[in-house]
Amino acid sequence: MSFQSLGRDDLLAQHELQQRNYAELQAKQLKLDLTRGKPSPEQLDLSNGLLSLPGDGADAYRDGHGTDTRNYGGVQGLPELRAIFAELLGLPVENLIAGNNASLEMMHDSVVFSLLHGGLDSPRPWSAEPTVKFLCPAPGYDRHFAITESFGIENVPVPIREDGPDVDVIEQLVASDPTIKGIWCVPVYSNPTGATYSTDVIRRLVQMPTAAKDFRLMWDNAYAVHTLTDEFVEPVDVLGLAAAAGNPNRPLVFASTSKITFAGAGVSFLGASADNIAWYLKHAGKKSIGPDKVNQLRHLRFFGDADGVRRQMQRHRELIAPKFALVAEILEDRLGESKIASWTDPKGGYFVSLDVWPGTAKRTVALAKDAGIAVTEAGSAFPYRKDPEDKNIRIAPTFPSLPDVRDAIDGLATCALLAATEALLGDK
């Protein structure tokens, strides 16, 4: 029964039903949170073995090369840990840096270094340009957009599809506008849509002519191994493809263990051409003599090898896949027949992207808040928090317990239905 096909009387009856459902929802006095994609306590417990590593034996603090990880130095990170993640990311180990906890910090630093000093191929520092723009596939990751926005860089939204961003649009924009210096990308299980970039899209992104010679792909491979199935996405060597296309310096690849081990005490990674690695370390070396190598050694011993990481991710999958399945089940049961919403069914990552009736996302989120269900601000997945259709809501089901996920999604569905009937009645 599509709500849009209902006459006014039937629609009014539905509206009254949803008002009653909403009153019952408020009476429950819930206090639930779907706002951020955080690992649950049970997921964090999977990595408690790190807390007893690297151990206290005579040489427990030395890596396989004999390096004393307690001391200064080693700006590129431990080679053995880099080798594990080079395999997982499909990159040469010599083109990978292992850093401290936050890959977001490496992204931030890369933008700051470009603003202050210019990147390789830059005619001048970005801060000396009258205008700097960044392309933002949307819906996308709000913290990416926040970095560029905070420095006065103009965020330009571009559509994203199931196989990645709309390259037809991107190619036209970058070919003629030298102020466009880069694009934010989440190539595997994109936040929040779950899209995985096709090889064709990746090839076009590294090959396309750009008016800015220093154009950068900010390649945040945050969910490279974060599958919700028993299969992993085959890594694509974006650095190799870019080099073959004559644009070796275009990609800056980022990743971390934040949603693999401890979100607040992991290891970050930056992959790039040899020249870009030297550029980054030259500037990063002014603020640090080296990363936390003891923590890197912990992770090396905890994982052992790339298969150890894959086994860890399957343990994560066992905990969170039922939550994603429950979200899909409830949304279909509550919203499917009414045809007032659509949503993604991701194969990996941390989010479900819900599109409610156009013009009602803010109202839906406000209703949810008043019923004790915290949801990410409507529009947050778009540059400047401006969703042109006011329809997108990001759902983060990993942190709450399974019963809380059930209550939160069921309640959110009630709010979406009520908001839709309000909007449709206003049109009739």
Swiss-Prot record:
Where is substrate bound in this sequence?
37
Q: Name one GO molecular function term.
A: L-aspartate:2-oxoglutarate aminotransferase activity
Residue location of crosslink Isoglutamyl lysine isopeptide (Lys-Gln) (interchain with Q-Cter in protein Pup): 339
Cofactor(s) required for function per UniProt: pyridoxal 5'-phosphate
Q: Which InterPro entries match?
A: AspAT_Ic, PyrdxlP-dep_Trfase, PyrdxlP-dep_Trfase_major, PyrdxlP-dep_Trfase_small
**Sorted alphabetically, which Pfam families does this protein's record hold?**
Asp_aminotransf (PF12897)
Q: Which domain of life is it from?
A: Bacteria
Q: Which Gene3D superfamilies match?
A: Aspartate Aminotransferase, domain 1 (3.90.1150.10), Type I PLP-dependent aspartate aminotransferase-like (Major domain) (3.40.640.10)
Keywords (alphabetical) are: Aminotransferase, Isopeptide bond, Pyridoxal phosphate, Transferase, Ubl conjugation
Disulphides: none
Q: Where does pyridoxal 5'-phosphate bind?
A: 72, 102-105, 191, 222-225, 256-258
Q: Which family does it belong to?
A: Belongs to the class-I pyridoxal-phosphate-dependent aminotransferase family.
Q: What is this protein called?
A: Putative aminotransferase MSMEG_6286/MSMEI_6121
